[in-house]
């Protein structure tokens, strides 16, 4: 993480002003993407700058770097980073391997086909070469979805959704999110009633606002 923090400061300076779109900075930005992948760090602004430079300078396009950017964006679901990055890649490059495979994985995650995602990932594990912490980051997203969707879930189903975890691995994630299991194999996620927090909305309308509306309507 020390290397990432050091590079982050330097990259931050590069991204200011007109220098942001200077193709001479691409090599530095591409190394920064690789550092993010290795150190399980993330900088969306810098990654979008790389994709924008590829748009302006198609001859400099790097498939491997783009793949790393997409995979890092997936680790930040449910935020819309993946969609933002995808929209900056032209259709021809989207059809290339491994970008095509990563876009498919992203589609499976965004549509919550989690079991199919793990199966597809298992068939393309080479995609994760040099990417630290990818699978656990995805599991955090899946746990987020489970937490807002279920009150109870079968133990076997949760294990499948998280990538066929062993019982001991599953217990680690249950402990992390405060989920408990009963003897029947059901996992208690949360009470939806407890998670609903009513909001009191108070809107103040002063006389000046009302009088101006009345005047304009006459």
UniProtKB/Swiss-Prot annotation:
Residue span, PCI domain: 42-204
Keyword hit for Coiled coil: no
Primary location class: nucleus
Keyword tags: Acetylation, Cytoplasm, Initiation factor, Nucleus, Phosphoprotein, Protein biosynthesis
Protein name: Eukaryotic translation initiation factor 3 subunit K
Residues modified to Phosphoserine: 217
Highest taxon listed in the record's lineage: Eukaryota
Molecular functions per Gene Ontology: ribosome binding; RNA binding; translation initiation factor activity
Record's signal peptide: none
Family annotation (Pfam families): CSN8_PSD8_EIF3K
Keyword Nucleus carried by entry: yes
Source lineage: Eukaryota, Metazoa, Chordata, Craniata, Vertebrata
Oligomeric and partner information: Component of the eukaryotic translation initiation factor 3 (eIF-3) complex, which is composed of 13 subunits: EIF3A, EIF3B, EIF3C, EIF3D, EIF3E, EIF3F, EIF3G, EIF3H, EIF3I, EIF3J, EIF3K, EIF3L and EIF3M. The eIF-3 complex appears to include 3 stable modules: module A is composed of EIF3A, EIF3B, EIF3G and EIF3I; module B is composed of EIF3F, EIF3H, and EIF3M; and module C is composed of EIF3C, EIF3D, EIF3E, EIF3K and EIF3L. EIF3C of module C binds EIF3B of module A and EIF3H of module B, thereby linking the three modules. EIF3J is a labile subunit that binds to the eIF-3 complex via EIF3B.
């Amino acid at each position: 993480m020390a290397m990432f923090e050091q590079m982050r400061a330097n990259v931050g300076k590069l991204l200011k002003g007109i220098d942001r779109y200077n193709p001479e900075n691409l090599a530095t930005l591409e190394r920064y993407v690789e550092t993010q992948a290795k150190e399980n760090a993330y900088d969306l602004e810098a990654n979008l700058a790389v994709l924008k430079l590829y748009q302006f300078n198609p001859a400099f396009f790097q498939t491997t770097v783009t793949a790393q950017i997409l995979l890092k964006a997936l680790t930040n679901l449910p935020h819309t980073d993946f969609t933002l990055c995808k929209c900056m890649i032209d259709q021809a490059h989207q059809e290339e391997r491994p970008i095509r495979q990563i876009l498919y994985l992203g589609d499976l995650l965004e549509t919550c086909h989690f079991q199919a995602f793990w199966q597809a990932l298992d068939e393309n594990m080479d995609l994760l070469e040099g990417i630290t912490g990818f699978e656990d980051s995805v599991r955090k997203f899946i746990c987020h979805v489970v937490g807002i969707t279920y009150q109870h879930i079968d133990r076997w189903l949760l294990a499948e959704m998280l990538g066929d975890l062993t019982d001991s691995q599953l217990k680690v994630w249950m402990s992390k999110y405060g989920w408990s299991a009963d003897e029947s194999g059901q996992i208690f996620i949360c009470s939806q009633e407890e998670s609903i927090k009513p909001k009191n909305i108070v809107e103040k309308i002063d006389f000046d606002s009302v009088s101006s509306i009345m005047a304009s309507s006459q």
